[in-house]
């Protein structure tokens, strides 16, 4: 006769094999967060940079079907339930896409772009920027000096095809 411990182990193993265990854990976390969330407490005002970053993360989470994580992000940050339009994000971030790159999150293309740029030469210098008086449109994007601009980030099939291959494995 099986013990309670044996039964628990079999159920846990079955749920893990079916890919349900992670979803259940995420759902429980989201429900606990929702129950503990104090809706009377105002959410912080997001800077333009934080809003764009959160939207990029939300798009990434949606693409990967991390819906519970996305719901926690939305609740915790005070993001609107309706995501910003992708064309608005690409315009604000000075991103140029091709048809293939439009099928993956912008964040994938940005990471792929900078990984390729890193292979082609020295790393881009990252400037410490105060978010109080800046938006993404006027943050210097030069490789090694503040006055040069590398131009728009080109998200092309080359920069996103690895993401497609990984996604469909």
Curated annotation (Swiss-Prot):
Subunit structure, as described in the record: Homooligomer; probably required for localization to centrosomes.
UniProt-annotated stretches for the region Necessary and sufficient for homooligomerization and localization to centrosomes and pericentriolar satellites: 1-104
Disulfide bonds, paired cysteine numbers: none
Protein keywords: Cell projection, Cilium biogenesis/degradation, Cytoplasm, Cytoskeleton
Protein name: Centrosomal protein 20
Polar residues compositional bias, start-end: 151-160
GO cellular component: centriolar satellite; centrosome; ciliary basal body; cytoplasm; motile cilium
Region of interest: Disordered: 135-169
Family in the record: Belongs to the CEP43 family.
Biological role stated in the UniProt entry: Involved in the biogenesis of cilia. Required for the recruitment of PLK1 to centrosomes and S phase progression.
Lineage of producing organism: Eukaryota, Metazoa, Chordata, Craniata, Vertebrata
Residues of the LisH domain: 49-81
Protein species of origin: Xenopus laevis
Any one Pfam family match given in the protein's UniProt record, by short name: FOP_dimer
Cellular compartment(s): Cell projection, Cilium; Cytoplasm, Cytoskeleton, Cilium basal body; Cytoplasm, Cytoskeleton, Microtubule organizing center, Centrosome; Cytoplasmic granule
Domain of life: Eukaryota
UniProt cross-references to InterPro entries, sorted A to Z: FOP_dimerisation-dom_N, LisH
Example GO BP: microtubule anchoring
């Amino acid at each position: 006769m099986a013990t309670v411990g044996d039964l628990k182990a079999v159920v846990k193993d079955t749920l893990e094999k079916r890919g349900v265990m992670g979803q259940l854990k995420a759902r429980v976390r989201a429900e606990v967060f929702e129950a503990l969330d104090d809706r009377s407490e105002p959410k912080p005002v997001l800077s333009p940079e934080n809003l764009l970053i959160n939207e990029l993360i939300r798009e990434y989470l949606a693409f990967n079907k991390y819906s519970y994580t996305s719901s926690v992000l939305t609740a915790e940050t005070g993001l609107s339930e309706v995501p910003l339009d992708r064309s608005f994000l690409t315009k604000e971030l000075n991103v140029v896409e091709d048809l293939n790159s439009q099928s993956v999150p912008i964040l994938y293309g940005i990471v792929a772009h900078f990984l390729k740029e890193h292979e082609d030469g020295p790393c881009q210098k990252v400037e410490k920027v105060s978010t109080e008086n800046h938006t993404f449109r006027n943050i210097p994007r030069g490789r090694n000096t503040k006055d040069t601009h590398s131009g728009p980030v080109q998200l092309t099939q080359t920069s996103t095809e690895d993401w497609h291959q990984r996604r469909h494995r």
